[in-house]
């Protein structure tokens, strides 16, 4: 994405990517909120907050959220019915009013009484049985898939996801499915190695500058964004940061559920007070449209005519229902670039299966891999595909926009969050396919490096992370921490260290336990050992490296006041980047968009408002 953004500027660029910043933004803005919330963050095992997310079943584990909220009411009603049909329901479950259920206001005993019969139901059924039921009933539940289950997955098979390549029978083909007028663009996939650099022929680029060096790389690019939740908005935030004009379409009558996320009792800002919505939609304009009203759809189509690209992350049937699917729009605007990103893609038997990022992590294999070898899967949190998939979505959209600039033609880009997750685990899939190795949960350990992990330091919940990449690193580490020569020599090879990893970790932990995490990391770094203190959200906010790079940007939100926003991890040498506004209030820019872009006068705008078109 960074390289494509550099190309989009049309100017020579040095592209500077920070691994630290790129990982930071996966926290969905939590670090930027630290000055207001003072929440440093904590681990929660197989739970999210106070409720369990990963549950054991008859032959493995499934992901199911027991949290409240409008978006989960039907889900909770469905699981209650299923448990009751199995004869396991109790009054704590059947008498619960899910429309007002708030897990954060319940005692531990009350939550346990609700969770008990659900847990018993899961233990009666296999992962396959539970997932088939989920698909049939639109239950947001997913199996914690292993490689064998992914290779046999009906949805992935329908979408022709795996291909044979270079001795691997099942290799992820691509995270992207492509549709274009006349099928001019073929689906990407693995190819034979290209020629050596010395044999490559220079290729001229027809991408022209979008503006002067004072303009962002995507300046002049116009994007219309539909959708809800996190994955879509995160992807489009890249473009807003680098100069694109982004208009986000919302509805007052059915607001984005993320606007209700994390709202505590008495929140003075209501739907304008969600920290997470604010963090993910910084830099965008906001327009409210009622897409169930014909004039609302008509206005949306006019804006699509204005836009270079449309981005949406609704369930597949939603845009079809509005008449705003790619097939309908491309008939009128063949140069349209449109990207659709949902949990399992736009086609296939499971395309309409509902779920959040927690279900995506399970379906995509991440839950199976995360945790300790002798314990249940524990995550990763939060919702890894909501953090991972946007990188793929942004990259695909950038490619589509550059293709349009070069050719004048449009394209539809279909990204499945699950497929993006599996694509990221391609080595795991290939290892299973070739060697039959399923892999196990290893905590912080590595199969290739010992030691490799996080070790406790002085203070409350403080750790230092370190790794030895070769035998020389190991010898240096033993000198620093005072391991005797006999022990150091006995463990001088990787094979020996792999066999004695428990012993090694105990020795290191004994040395780190009474030491300050930062001082320990600096001591190890000075000796040439890679080590860092494990940062919490407060540490990240105060990090001098992040401050030097301007990672956090403070803007004044009209209701919440000063808010911290995070940059997306890369800089260009000859194109500025940043945010010119916080997230939009509901309908905040209606007058600007309708008047300045669509040319509607005040009288017409008032009529639209009175007739519910702008709800």
Language model segments and positions:
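Short beta-strand-initiation
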Residues: 48-50, 173, 273-275, 449-452, ...
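Short, hinge-like loop/turn segments at secondary-structure boundaries
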Residues: 33-34, 159-162, 263-268, 354-359, ...
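Active-site-adjacent "lid/gating" segments in soluble enzymes
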Residues: 1-68, 72-81, 179, 183, ...
